[in-house]
Structure formats: structure tokens, C-alpha cells
Amino acid sequence: MNTKYIFVTGGVASSLGKGIIAASLAKLLQARGLRVTIQKFDPYINIDPGTLNPYEHGECYVTEDGAETDLDLGHYERFLGIHTSKANNVTTGKIYHTVITKEREGAYLGKTVQIVPHITDEIKRRMLLLGKTGDYDVIITEVGGTVGDIESQPFIEAMRQLQWELPEEDFLSIHLTLIPYLKAAQELKTKPTQHSVQELQALGVHPDIIVCRTEKELSPELRHKIALFCNVKPGHVIQSIDAWSIYQVPLNMEAENLGKMVVDKLEIPGLPEPDLEALKAFLERLKHPLQEVDIALVGKYVELQDAYKSIQESFVHAGAANSCKVRVHTLQAENINDGNADEVLGKMDGILVAPGFGERGLEGKISAVKYARTHNVPFFGICLGMQMAVVEFARNVLGYAEAASTEVNPRTPHPVIDLMEDQKSTTIKGGTMRLGAYKCRLAEGSLARSIYGTEEIAERHRHRYEFNNAYLRQMQEAGLKVSGVNPDTGLVEIVEIPSHPFFIATQFHPEYKSTPEHPQPLFVHFVKACMDKR
């Protein structure tokens, strides 16, 4: 069987959920026994989102091989239970960088380098790259942005060319659009969808399936109208109605026959019925919790829901594993201090101090750590959260009042957190941190060892600063146990306080590897500790 290529575009408005639709379709195909992966093509000129402020584009998701990518890759991994890679996220910046580098090397033999064919050829090469590995039956490509945007036009043109170049049964186009509901008229309006599809068709791409985001059910008459004016088969207009959980969307799409439509169009015979029992069992646990807990997520980007997307989703997975509803309260670190910590955090069953960069909000994070440590509240720190746990311990237990990270105070007399040695000569910011999966050896008898149930793990990282091993002996003697280290470098990966009911912090990002079917163990045990406290 030839590799099949599916493209998902969006129209009318942004943030309709192309990534969720792409991941849901991938889940339906995977459940039929097909080998599927998804790739995201982003039309911004940044090489990757690694240097983007989370307020700009949400969370930066890190893959096993160290790629800093769009948060949609997190959805892909969580829905499918697979690992993505650098090849799964392509930006305009990467495309132009490759083409300009080739031009400087003389690869184009003196030709005038243009959008068409040189940029579009490179886009097509990347679109087909994963399909040529032989590892996948189906490649789903999500094209970022909205049809009509100037920056996405080269990607649409590359799609148009592939639609013409590939066999008809190997190419499928899905267009996600919005059907707004006018409350005053009590009517769903199809005109924006008609215009969006017409614009896509004017660019030479003809969608095979139209998925309509809507608050209300689409009547058969409305579906027929959309099909008629958008030139698709009557049965190929389907609805994506607002769901109570994103993990319900694959089941909704299966009920709309999306999986069957795609398999039929791509002419893939002999597939079994989809096996979605594990997903249904997860949703059943999620929908019927036996207990509830309140957990504070203390961070500096809390105003944007997507800034801590993987952490939020990890709590969903861990909650279902414990048959517990986790209410996550996102708290702005800048608003927390020693004086109001009891008022702000007193009703919480657990405290998680989130990752981040820079000075803003650090003292608030330290106050949150102190409150959790001194009031026996279950605590979980991630990356910067772990570093601030170390700073708080140094200040308030070791008595080093001026202890700090050199990230914010290069002249501190007690640099308990310091720049990694191999980072000290680095001047380029993008893609130069310690990124991707690294090994961590867990100490015998530690909380971390009991949680993971194994001696060695591998988790993903994204940081420049580390625990300063010059303070290792003093910290351990005072009660802060180092329970996880990198076996190759000795870099401290996990700290915990054995005398505390549950106090653990990691330099790595465990949230990147949590899925509904395999919830991350640290999150599962943290939620369990919060339940026990309550």
C-alpha cells in the first residue's frame, strides 16, 4: 500500500481546533490498525517556538529528540501514544533557512530563487519526508493559520501541487470551518463557511470533507446546503459540536463516520472495526470521579490557558487514574508573598510550582514553596519550580539569606542554582538549551524510586541552569535529598524531602510524556497525595 497523505486546513477563524481534529482522525485510523503520524506546518518565520513568549503562542512542547515545537504536537502524542520528532514540526523559518542556505552553497546553479518553485518544492519535500521512511501508512499534515492569510499561501500552493502529483486515492483534504450561531435570529449561518471554501478552491485546493465547528446540531438540510454550495459529497459535511472533553472528540468523529469516509476515499480495504475501548474506559473514569481535590498551579503565564497545556492535561490523566476530579487553580506568582500565602494557598490540597524563565514572579514561587514545605502541603516542582525549591531551602533551612540562581543574580554569594558549564560560552538563544530526553538514575529507598518502580528513567528537559553540586553535601545533611541524578554527568535531576508527606521536584518536564492510557507516575502519585491530605 502506498503511503496516504491527509491535509487539514482551517477557515473563518483561528483556534477552531485543527490539531484536535487531526489527532482525533489519527486516533480513529490507528484504532483500525494503521500506522499513523501527524505533522504541523506553522506559517510563522521563527525557526521554532523555542524563543517565543508563551503569551504569543502557548506552551513550547519538547520532543524526545529535543525539538522545541508547537503545542499541537503534545496533542498528537497524547492522543496516539507515540513519539514525534523534529521532522513533525516545520515552520516558514525552517523552510526559508534551508532554501537560503542552499542558495549560498550554490545548489541552485545560478537560478533566480523564488517562492515558486523553490520554496514550494522544499515545503513539498518536507510534507512527504515522513512518508518515505516506510514507518507509516498515513501521514496527517495540519497546516497552521487560516485560509486567506498571506503567510500560509505557499503551504496551500504546495498542497495544490501535491493534490495534482499524487494518485487520487493517496491524497485527501479536510477543511475545518466555523458555523456561527446568531442568537437574535436563532439561526446557524453557513455563509462564512461557503466563502472560506470558495477561497480555498480559488487557490486550487478542493476539500473532500468539511468539518463544521458548531455550538448547535447541524440539520440534514443545513448539511446538504453546505455540500451543494461547497461542491462536496452530501455525506461529507460533518459537525464537530462542542465536547465536554477533548478526548471525547474522537468518539464524536467516529459517530459522524469520519473514519469510514477517510478509509473509503483513500481506498484502504480490509480494515477491522476501530478498537476504542481503552479510550472509552478512560472517559468513563474521567466522567464519574469518586473524589475531588484542589491544586494550585503557581506560574507567571497563568493568564493564558495554553501556557501550561501539558501540565493541565497531565492532571486530567492523573485524575482519571485516581478516579478523582482535579480542580487546577492557576495562580499568578507575582501576587503571592509570605504575608498572604496562607490566604491564597490555605485551601489548596496541593501546590505545583510551574516551569518558566526570568526574574518576574520568582519570589512568589519561593513563597509558595515555603508554604508547602512548612505546612506539610503536598508539593511538586518542575524545572524552575525545582530550582526555586532549592533556593527556598538554602535561604530558610541552611540560612543563606542571599541564596539565588545566577539567572537573576549573577553576583549572589550563594549560587545554589548556576548556569550549566557548557552553556557559559553560548550566545545564541534558539535551540541551544539542554533539550530532549536524558537518563536519570534513581536513589534506592527514595520517593522517586518508589513512584517509578525502576532504577533508571529517561525524561525530557528544557533548561540552561542546574543545581550547583558545590552545595550538594550541605543540602543533603540538612534534609533535602538528591534522589535522581544523570548517570553520565552527575547533574541533579530530582530533589525531595523525606520528612515531608510529599515534597518532590524535578529538573526535567514529566508532563511531556503523560497520556490518557499511560498517565505520568509523578502526577498520579502527587494527585494521590493530595487526596490523602484531604
What is each of the regions a protein language model found here?
Residues 56-64, 243-247, 353, 374-380, ...:
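Short beta-alpha connecting loops at secondary-structure transitions
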Residues 304-307, 320-324, 338-341, 360-364, ...:
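Extended hydrophobic-aromatic, low-complexity segments
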Residues 16-19, 23-27, 31, 344-439, ...:
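Cysteine-nucleophile active-site neighborhood
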Residues 42, 383, 394, 463, ...:
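Active-site glycine-centered loops adjacent to acidic/histidine catalytic or metal-binding residues
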Residues 236-241, 329, 408, 485-488:
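Beta-strand->loop->alpha-helix junctions that form or flank phosphate-binding loops
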Residues 1-324, 333-350, 357-358, 365-371, ...:
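Flexible phosphate-sensing "switch/lid" loops adjacent to ATP/NTP-binding sites
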Residues 435, 439, 443-534:
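C-terminal and late-domain segments of enzyme folds
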